């Protein structure tokens, strides 16, 4: 079950592969995400050494958040993955020109996980072509519904 989706990623990129990664979060962030107060539309994943980090993910603190904790809504958050998976991603990102984008946040065994996609950027004409295809599929379904 998805908590937050990044539909813009599917519009802007061709998603080749998806991976699941854990997130290093603070307590107030977990509560805010459970309340649906997170945004990953402008977020992206970077590599620093042998580690993955997510930047641009905005988590708005709840009103009930502690006053003793300084809440930074757009801080850099570390992603947790197996070393072999990270090594494979590093190779593809550095050599093949791929980029990493967060696709959604979801629960897995009670923990909040992020699905990240190995993606290539779409050109403007690719976006138009995808839109035409979507429209044609919708029209085709409508025509089939009318005839039967």
UniProtKB/Swiss-Prot annotation:
Major site of localization recorded for this protein: cytoplasm
Subcellular location field: Cytoplasm
Cysteines joined through disulfide linkages: none
InterPro entries assigned: SmpB, SsrA-bd_prot, SsrA-bd_prot_CS
One Pfam family matching this protein: SmpB
Region (Disordered), start-end ranges: 127-148
Keyword Cytoplasm: yes
Role according to the record: Required for rescue of stalled ribosomes mediated by trans-translation. Binds to transfer-messenger RNA (tmRNA), required for stable association of tmRNA with ribosomes. tmRNA and SmpB together mimic tRNA shape, replacing the anticodon stem-loop with SmpB. tmRNA is encoded by the ssrA gene; the 2 termini fold to resemble tRNA(Ala) and it encodes a 'tag peptide', a short internal open reading frame. During trans-translation Ala-aminoacylated tmRNA acts like a tRNA, entering the A-site of stalled ribosomes, displacing the stalled mRNA.
The protein's name: SsrA-binding protein
Organism whose genome encodes this protein: Aromatoleum aromaticum (strain DSM 19018 / LMG 30748 / EbN1)
């Amino acid at each position: 079950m998805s908590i937050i989706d990044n539909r813009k990623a599917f519009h802007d990129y061709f998603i080749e592969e998806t991976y699941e990664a854990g997130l290093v979060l603070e307590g107030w962030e977990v509560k805010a995400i459970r309340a649906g107060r997170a945004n990953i539309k402008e977020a992206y994943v970077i590599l620093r050494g042998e580690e993955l980090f997510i930047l641009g993910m905005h988590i708005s603190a709840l009103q009930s958040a502690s006053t003793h904790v300084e809440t930074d809504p757009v801080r850099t958050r570390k992603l947790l993955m197996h070393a072999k998976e990270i090594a494979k991603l590093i190779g593809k990102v550095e050599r093949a020109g791929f980029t990493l984008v967060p696709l959604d946040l979801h629960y897995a065994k009670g923990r909040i996980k992020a699905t990240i996609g190995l993606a290539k950027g779409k050109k403007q004409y690719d976006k138009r072509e995808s839109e035409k295809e979507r429209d044609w599929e919708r029209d085709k379904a409508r025509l089939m519904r009318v005839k039967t």
